[in-house]
């Protein structure tokens, strides 16, 4: 059995039914099945990519990155994931947005969500919380 098939088989055994069409903000709000499902999908995508099979699920689209804390690995990981799925990345510069004038990140994310397929937010306000 291929790595791809193993990943799909694993995914089929997990209860991830509540994830479709939902936001993914806080890992600690997700069940173990849902978190394992994320890893199973990542493994399936990796298996396809290693065989040079396109993983693009979008012909075009926009991925917005809003990283409130400096990050190299997270920023490039997000950009790589967007590219893998067929999305263009646009960085949101808070100094050039209404956030600089008091608009909350939530308000900004809500507004840009109408134009974006995915929004990646990094904000270290809950250091060490993660999924427990």
How would you describe each model-predicted region?
Residues 56-132:
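Phosphate/diphosphate ligand-binding glycine-rich loop within oxidoreductases
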Residues 2-76, 80:
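Positively charged, low-complexity intrinsically disordered leader regions
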